[in-house]
Amino acid sequence: MAVVRVRAIVALLCLVAALGLAEPLEEEDGVLVLRAANFEQALAAHRHLLVEFYAPWCGHCKALAPEYAKAAAQLKAEGSEIRLAKVDATEEAELAQQFGVRGYPTIKFFRNGDKAAPREYTAGREADDIVSWLKKRTGPAATTLTDAAAAETLVDSSEVVVIGFFKDVTSDAAKEFLLAAESVDDIPFGISSSADVFSKYQLSQDGVVLFKKFDEGRNNFEGDLTKDNLLNFIKSNQLPLVIEFTEQTAPKIFGGEIKTHILLFLPKSVSDYEGKLDNFKTAAGNFKGKILFIFIDSDHSDNQRILEFFGLKKEECPAVRLITLEEEMTKYKPESDDLTADKIKEFCNKFLEGKIKPHLMSQDLPEDWDKQPVKVLVGKNFEEVAFDENKNVFVEFYAPWCGHCKQLAPIWDKLGETYRDHENIVIAKMDSTANEVEAVKIHSFPTLKFFPAGSGRNVIDYNGERTLEGFKKFLESGGQDGAAADDDLEDLETDEETDLEEGDDDEQKIQKDEL
């Protein structure tokens, strides 16, 4: 027994010594700086820990940094036990891999030291969004408001706040309200039975009000008070009628449930800027909850890639485009360049009625498109060349800015030279940022597809080595050696997206934000 006691005492002393020797966690602007060596220490020390995995070169991360620090300072000032931390994922690759980091920034919330299932951060990238989300995750679904002062403080605390007014907070309606509150991550909720609170906000009976610091200022819920109806009400009213696309608003835009977006590309420098924006807002009021109206400053350098994605040039703006962000992104273009409220409403109504065909971009066909070993495809000649029943056509779908495409270019040119005079093999390429075709949807770059001869309109994805020998084996085998099996296609797409995220951050924007 004595030996056992001695060992226990020694173990305890070692533990105490280890804890005593643990270095204080480094901080930058109130944010903990974590590495693999101190990650466990941070989890043990803080019950609620929000961790940003970032890359130093990432533009989105740089934009987030001041807001992230501001959120940390706000929580500290309030005496909160919640801490914010960050990990340089380019330096701590194993740590990033452990938590499934594939893009930047990735933000995860750890509770009670649990590494097994951290929660993905899903709200916006402004300090208020971060603080609001964390309070929702660590506190009650709705704050109990005992008096008018408490209600006013809550309403002033965030851009959007939802308050339930219930004389009996145990009623069925109040329970439905709380269920809705638990389902919404990024909006603070309050609940009150106080006559003082009812009076302040001019309510004489039970109800729900969404308060916001824009547009109408408040929306009163009407109808049968159920969780689903409340969530639909919130979805329809939580965003401005027109929201400007920025680094900060992107998560709200793409993280929401409204997947149909109409975009106004408008330079802020144009003389009638306010008038055109007002027309857009007037039209927006007719489609709340159905179509999200987004304004993009076409003069801003950060938005040039988005213009390219829609096949627009700065001199063509103002312009309107519509996009659906379902499994396949589909773009639509109005028939008229008229940007009056009536024309915009007409365009949206026709879309909702299914009366508009998708808009497919195409460059003009170069006169010498077939004069080089690698043939140039555009939207206008794609069908004719790729689905030629007498030819086997191997196509690279690329983006001019893609680093992996640039690395592939000399190999693809050599492949073109190799089969330059072949009677039925054609090597081709298409700039998929400027050309779209109905038969093929491209999600990452480069994408390589083989269109074998015959009448079947077959398409084979290439998943082999990107070497001259690998390509030759694939072609000589009739598209068999190196072809992606059906169950490999998802992995192939995942790998490509990972490649994209390793490149310049602006290159990621289209893939991550889907614009």
Curated annotation (Swiss-Prot):
Record motif Prevents secretion from ER, residues: 512-515
List S-S links within the chain: C58-C61, C402-C405
**EC numbers:** 5.3.4.1
Domain of life, per the record?
Eukaryota
User: Which positions does the site annotation Lowers pKa of C-terminal Cys of first active site cover?
Assistant: R125
Q: Does the keyword Nucleotide-binding apply?
A: no
Q: Which protein family is named in the record?
A: Belongs to the protein disulfide isomerase family.
Q: What is this protein called?
A: Protein disulfide-isomerase
Native species of this protein?
Answer: Gallus gallus
Upper lineage is: Eukaryota, Metazoa, Chordata, Craniata, Vertebrata
